[in-house]
Amino acid sequence: MKVVKLEDVIGTEQEVKGENWTSRRLLLKKDGMGYSVHDTIIKAGTETHIWYQNHLEAVYCIEGEGEVETVKDGKVWPIKANEIYALDEHDEHLLRAKTDMRMVCVFNPPITGKETHDENGVYPLVDDE
């Protein structure tokens, strides 16, 4: 059994900061669960281009309000607390935060914890060995 406290992740290498977000990575590939779990804060007033070509992601919003737009078709989904969205087709998307948003993100395959978005919004596949 593994128990991870958010307070033990904050300020470590498992807390990764981007221009628009902070990702506290709670479970990683090394934990052997087959997925990774992140507690992520998206900053109010930002737009983030994301395209997980190598990962599927489910995102549960626990605080805040924003929207997700799929680039392929321009469809926009409002997102608020207590809603989940799943990027089940490696959807290229824009995440816009109207307020600070706190999200619980689950990735498959799991990330190693070293990843950050590249210029296309992609997390590369990283071997942590």
Swiss-Prot record:
Top EC group: lyase
Signal peptide: none
Record-listed E.C. numbers: 4.2.1.108
TM annotation in the entry: none
Organism superkingdom: Bacteria
GO terms (BP aspect): ectoine biosynthetic process
Pathway terms, separated by semicolons: Amine and polyamine biosynthesis; ectoine biosynthesis; L-ectoine from L-aspartate 4-semialdehyde: step 3/3
The UniProt record lists the keyword Ligase: no
Reaction(s) catalysed by this chain's protein: (2S)-4-acetamido-2-aminobutanoate = L-ectoine + H2O
MF annotations from Gene Ontology: ectoine synthase activity
Keywords linked to the UniProt accession: Lyase
HAMAP family, per database record: Ectoine_synth
Role, per record: Catalyzes the circularization of gamma-N-acetyl-alpha,gamma-diaminobutyric acid (ADABA) to ectoine (1,4,5,6-tetrahydro-2-methyl-4-pyrimidine carboxylic acid), which is an excellent osmoprotectant.
NCBIfam families: PRK13290.1
Family, similarity comment: Belongs to the ectoine synthase family.
Entry protein name: L-ectoine synthase
Organism encoding this protein: Halalkalibacterium halodurans (strain ATCC BAA-125 / DSM 18197 / FERM 7344 / JCM 9153 / C-125)
